[in-house]
């Protein structure tokens, strides 16, 4: 089965695990998924990442992060730029998620970065997703 949107698949797996409060999520590995997950790790939305080989397929195991009494750290995830409708922004148009409380992940010429880093670098790019 061919996956047309691996980032949407990643976000959906995380969203579903978050709803039922799973501790661990496993996703097939790719360079762009690793970059998105590293940003989520730096921003404090997930606990840790572990890459491993499952036969011929490389996988990523990520540990979900919850607060006291299993409160969700991730309130929402939204895919913005999709294969059928790409969404780009110039450096002046970089979105703020919930007035800066959330994070926009943007694919730029300098790599995959958060909205704050893109503003600091002075670059625009493709808006991959919002996390809050």
From Swiss-Prot:
SUPFAM superfamilies found in the cross-reference section: Ribosomal protein S8 (SSF56047)
InterPro entries cross-referenced by the UniProt entry: Ribosomal_uS8, Ribosomal_uS8_CS, Ribosomal_uS8_sf
GO molecular function terms attached to this record: rRNA binding; structural constituent of ribosome
Keyword Signal annotated: no
GO cellular component terms listed in the entry, alphabetical order: ribonucleoprotein complex; ribosome
Pfam family, one: Ribosomal_S8
Record keyword Flavoprotein present: no
PROSITE patterns, A to Z: RIBOSOMAL_S8
This protein's UniProt keywords: Ribonucleoprotein, Ribosomal protein, RNA-binding, rRNA-binding
GO process terms (BP): translation
Subunit structure: Part of the 30S ribosomal subunit. Contacts proteins S5 and S12.
Record family assignment: Belongs to the universal ribosomal protein uS8 family.
Function noted in UniProt: One of the primary rRNA binding proteins, it binds directly to 16S rRNA central domain where it helps coordinate assembly of the platform of the 30S subunit.
Protein name: Small ribosomal subunit protein uS8
């Amino acid at each position: 089965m061919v996956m047309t949107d691996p980032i949407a698949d990643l976000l959906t797996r995380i969203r579903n695990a978050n709803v039922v409060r799973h501790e661990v999520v496993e996703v097939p590995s790719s360079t762009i998924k690793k970059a998105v997950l590293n940003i989520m790790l730096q921003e404090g939305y997930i606990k840790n990442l572990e890459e491993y080989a499952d036969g011929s397929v490389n996988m990523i195991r990520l540990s979900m992060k919850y607060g006291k009494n299993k409160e969700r750290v991730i309130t929402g995830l939204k895919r913005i730029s999709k294969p059928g409708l790409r969404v780009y922004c110039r450096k002046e148009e970089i979105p703020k998620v919930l007035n800066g409380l959330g994070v926009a992940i943007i694919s730029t010429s300098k790599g995959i970065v958060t909205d704050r880093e893109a503003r600091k670098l002075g670059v625009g790019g493709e808006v991959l997703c919002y996390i809050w």
